[in-house]
From Swiss-Prot:
Subunit composition and interactions: The 4 large subunits of the cytochrome b6-f complex are cytochrome b6, subunit IV (17 kDa polypeptide, PetD), cytochrome f and the Rieske protein, while the 4 small subunits are PetG, PetL, PetM and PetN. The complex functions as a dimer.
Remarks, miscellaneous: Heme 1 (or BH or b566) is high-potential and absorbs at about 566 nm, and heme 2 (or BL or b562) is low-potential and absorbs at about 562 nm.
Gene Ontology cellular-component terms listed: chloroplast thylakoid membrane
Protein name as it appears in the record: Cytochrome b6
GO biological process: photosynthesis; respiratory electron transport chain
Database matches in SUPFAM superfamilies: Transmembrane di-heme cytochromes
Length: 215
């Protein structure tokens, strides 16, 4: 093992990287509430793992979406566990995110020079809610269908462009296959990529600026 380590150390200086990570100063006022962001990230990683596993069985069509979820829950080995973990970690992620936002706000973590960290965090919050909205409809049961219809119908109230926005979201004048395809694409590709980009920016800024001091 030492030869393998030395080989990588010679080329990548991995010890310097490890020292930089482990030697970062942590202020004495930090407590368990400062772990809420990390708990949100943990829930996100569970979402990625379980969501990836479910893509092997889920079929994003109005005719087969519900039956594929039913098959996953009743026939696939541990399918019920994977979907349940996905569902409950999604709820936990939203809860941890809300608590994290409150902690940052109440401790003044959004103030100069951490404004951009706060902005990227707010964007990540919007993306998290978007995950919930798009994922809720994917089983295409009665609850998912009507939730999709209501959510995509909200922009109708916007003057002039409301109808166009509704049609853009639905892919048609009414909710159907095009809507499900859009939601599936957003949920499994667009939103994860955007989340990873803003998470990277968020973490790099935290790493650069450190944890905010006490009020």
């Amino acid at each position: 093992m030492s030869k393998v380590y030395d080989w990588f150390q010679e080329r990548l200086s991995i010890q310097d990287i490890a020292d930089d990570i482990t030697s970062k100063y942590v202020p004495p006022h930090v407590n368990i509430f400062y772990c809420l962001g990390g708990m949100t990230l943990t829930c996100f990683l569970v979402q990625v793992a379980t969501g990836f596993a479910m893509t092997f069985y889920y079929r994003p069509t109005v005719a087969e979406a519900f039956s594929s979820v039913e098959y996953m829950m009743t026939q696939v080995n541990f399918g019920w566990l994977i979907r349940s973990l996905h569902r409950w970690s999604a709820s936990m992620m939203v809860l941890m995110m809300i608590l994290h936002i409150f902690r940052v706000y109440l401790t003044g973590g959004f103030k100069k020079p951490r404004e951009l960290t706060w902005i990227t965090g707010v964007i990540l919050g919007v993306l998290t809610v978007s995950f919930g909205v798009t994922g809720y409809s994917l089983p295409w049961d009665q609850v998912g269908y009507w939730a999709c219809k209501i959510v995509t119908g909200v922009p109708e109230a916007i003057p002039v462009v409301g109808s166009s926005l509704v049609e853009l979201l639905r892919g048609d004048v009414s909710v159907g296959q095009a809507t499900l395809t859009r939601f599936y694409s957003l949920h499994t590709l667009v939103l994860p990529v955007l989340s990873l980009v803003f998470m990277l920016a968020h973490f790099l800024m935290i790493r650069k600026q450190g944890i905010s001091g006490p009020l």
